[in-house]
Amino acid sequence: MTPETKTKILKYILTPLSWIYGSVTAVRNWMFDNRILPQEEFGVPIVSVGNLTVGGTGKTPHTEYIVGMLAMDYNTAVLSRGYKRKTKGFILANSNSTPDSVGDEPLQIYRKFGSRVKVAVCEDRRRGIREMIKQFPNIELIVLDDAFQHRYVKPKVSVLLMDYSPPYITIICFRWAG
């Protein structure tokens, strides 16, 4: 089988699946937009950092930059899912944490800021935020790493990153402008 044939077969299989995925996502977003599915707000401002493309947009460095600026004036915390960690539930990063316990990116953030910034992981963002507020009632701001698609939490501010590629940028700019 030639590579072109394989590509055509994959195209015919994946295209209908992408339509299904897009339809389900559209219905889900409509349900959030019309308040059928609830968005939870918290007494602490939430900053959500996310991206439009898969991987490689620099979410963690941007999160670190945002946290570095905000931590100068606010008692700041970071909450992440802890991608590829081998643990479950809410875990607060500490000096004994490993990539297996909290994930490599949350550990990187913890090592950069140390005790100045609380860094935690939890696969359930709402539970993680509640736990962070409960354990540290003096927290003034929580930054959610990689949370743009997580609509159950209503952020005060969303920072959206994307790769720079002219066709994509052009489409978005024209759509926003017109």
Predicted features by range, described:
Residues 1-45:
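A transmembrane-helix-recognition feature enriched in membrane-embedded lipid enzymes
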Residues 83-178:
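Phosphate/Mg2+-binding loops and adjacent switch elements
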